[in-house]
Amino acid sequence: MRSTTPINTTPINQLGYEACRDELIEVVRLLEQGGLNLDMSLKLWERGEQLAKRCEEHLDGARQRVADVLSARQVEEA
């Protein structure tokens, strides 16, 4: 049973969407692979939850930007 797996310590709020997504994929892979002790599994799971939330924030921001541009375009065309 492995007790140490490197966990990225970069603050999540400093990661872009792609970096969050890629790290989240790696966290899921490690958890699905198994062989980690409980403490490491919990740390990875917590990091994964934070990464998933940050990915959603990035996607929400992108959706809002698209909506703003489309709304501005409609106003210009009116």
Curated annotation (Swiss-Prot):
Enzyme class: hydrolase
Reaction equation(s) it catalyzes: Exonucleolytic cleavage in either 5'- to 3'- or 3'- to 5'-direction to yield nucleoside 5'-phosphates
Compartment annotation: Cytoplasm
A GO cellular component entry from the record: exodeoxyribonuclease VII complex
A GO biological-process term: DNA catabolic process
Coiled coil regions, renumbered to chain: none
Entry-linked InterPro entries: Exonuc_VII_S, Exonuc_VII_ssu_sf
A GO molecular-function descriptor: exodeoxyribonuclease VII activity
Oligomer status and interactors: Heterooligomer composed of large and small subunits.
Cited function: Bidirectionally degrades single-stranded DNA into large acid-insoluble oligonucleotides, which are then degraded further into small acid-soluble oligonucleotides.
PANTHER family: EXODEOXYRIBONUCLEASE 7 SMALL SUBUNIT
Family designation: Belongs to the XseB family.
Protein name per Swiss-Prot or TrEMBL: Exodeoxyribonuclease 7 small subunit
Organism: Mycobacterium leprae (strain TN)
Taxonomy of the source species: Bacteria, Bacillati, Actinomycetota, Actinomycetes, Mycobacteriales
Gene: xseB
